[in-house]
Every structure is written in structure tokens, then in C-alpha cells.
């Protein structure tokens, strides 16, 4: 399940592109998530009222949250699988406060892959997509373990 050093390098190379515009990428990821899986919007009191893509694009709060999400994910990815310290508080808040099911993390992973491919087709070919999929799967597996430790089976 672990990634090779070469796979981590592919992940981090494309992540460098993401970091040039975290808020924009994050906004695109959340819009893709909410459009593809409208049920996920119900978990966000701040965004529930946003019904159209235009409303979502105009929301500074959505852009800020997208930045927060991708900043946290970037910190996790840079740990190359040694992310226990970063996952603990994230699992705690997502399991006990926000009650975000693992399935929703799969949905946002799909949105991330889609956005990276559409924004960076040259840097995000099949090998990089495969590596990112593995990295996101590792993240989900490890956060699911933390969820269970917290008694959340979402």
C-alpha cells in the first residue's frame, strides 16, 4: 500500500503547482465535490445556501475553506505516509464534530484527482494520477483507523 520514493516525488511535483494557488484549487475541488455529490453540501452549514456554481464561485468563504482543506492535505502529503501527528486532530474534528463519513473523503479524493488533471494535464499524467490515488487512499485508510479509535464508524 505504501508509495515508492518515485511515486511520492510525482505527488509532490504536482502539489507544487497546487501550492501556487491553493485557494483557487481548493475552491475548484469543493465546487466539483458539491456538484458531483450534493449530499456533501449538507455537512457545511456555511455553504448550504449555495445552490449554483456561480454562487459557489462568488463565495469568499468557500474559497477560504478550499484553501484550508488543501493546506492541511499538503501538510499530510509532504510527510510521505508518516502523517500520524497531522491526522490525529483532523480525524478528531471530522469524526466527532463534523461527522464526515469516510465515503465523503472518497468523493473529495475523486474531486482532487479531477481538478488536478484538468488544471495540470502535462504534470498529471497516468503515473502521477496513480501515485496521487495511492497517496489519497493511504490517507483515507489511516484516517479510517483513527475514526474507529474514536468510536466513529462513518
Curated annotation (Swiss-Prot):
It holds the Pfam family Globin. Belongs to the globin family. SUPFAM superfamilies: Globin-like (SSF46458). The gene is MB. One of its GO terms (molecular function) is oxygen carrier activity. The modification Phosphoserine is found at residue 4. Monomeric heme protein which primary function is to store oxygen and facilitate its diffusion within muscle tissues. Reversibly binds oxygen through a pentacoordinated heme iron and enables its timely and efficient release as needed during periods of heightened demand. Depending on the oxidative conditions of tissues and cells, and in addition to its ability to bind oxygen, it also has a nitrite reductase activity whereby it regulates the production of bioactive nitric oxide. Keywords: Cytoplasm, Heme, Iron, Metal-binding, Muscle protein, Oxidoreductase, Oxygen transport, Phosphoprotein, Transport. Its EC number is 1.7.-.-, 1.11.1.-. It is found in: Cytoplasm, Sarcoplasm. It is an enzyme of class 1 (oxidoreductase). Nitrite binds at residue 65. This is Myoglobin. It catalyses: Fe(III)-heme b-[protein] + nitric oxide + H2O = Fe(II)-heme b-[protein] + nitrite + 2 H(+); H2O2 + AH2 = A + 2 H2O. Monomeric. One of its GO terms (cellular component) is sarcoplasm. The keyword Magnesium does not apply. Heme b binds at residue 94. One of its GO terms (biological process) is removal of superoxide radicals. Residues 2-148 form the Globin domain. The modification Phosphothreonine is found at residue 68. O2 binds at residue 65. It comes from the Eukaryota.
Amino acid at each position: 500500500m505504501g508509495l515508492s520514493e518515485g511515486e511520492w516525488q510525482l505527488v509532490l511535483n504536482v502539489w507544487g503547482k497546487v501550492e501556487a494557488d491553493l485557494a483557487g484549487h481548493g475552491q475548484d475541488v469543493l465546487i466539483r465535490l458539491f456538484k458531483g455529490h450534493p449530499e456533501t453540501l449538507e455537512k457545511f452549514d456555511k455553504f448550504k445556501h449555495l445552490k449554483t456554481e456561480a454562487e459557489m464561485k462568488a463565495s469568499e468563504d468557500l474559497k477560504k475553506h478550499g484553501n484550508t482543506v488543501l493546506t492541511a492535505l499538503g501538510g499530510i502529503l509532504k510527510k510521505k505516509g508518516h502523517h500520524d501527528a497531522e491526522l490525529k486532530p483532523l480525524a478528531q474534528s471530522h469524526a466527532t464534530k463534523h461527522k464526515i463519513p469516510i465515503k465523503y473523503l472518497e468523493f473529495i479524493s475523486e474531486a482532487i484527482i479531477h481538478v488536478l488533471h484538468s488544471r495540470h494535464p502535462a504534470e498529471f499524467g497516468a503515473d502521477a494520477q496513480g501515485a496521487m490515488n495511492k497517496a489519497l487512499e493511504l490517507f483515507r485508510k489511516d484516517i479510517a483507523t483513527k475514526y474507529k479509535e474514536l468510536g466513529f464508524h462513518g
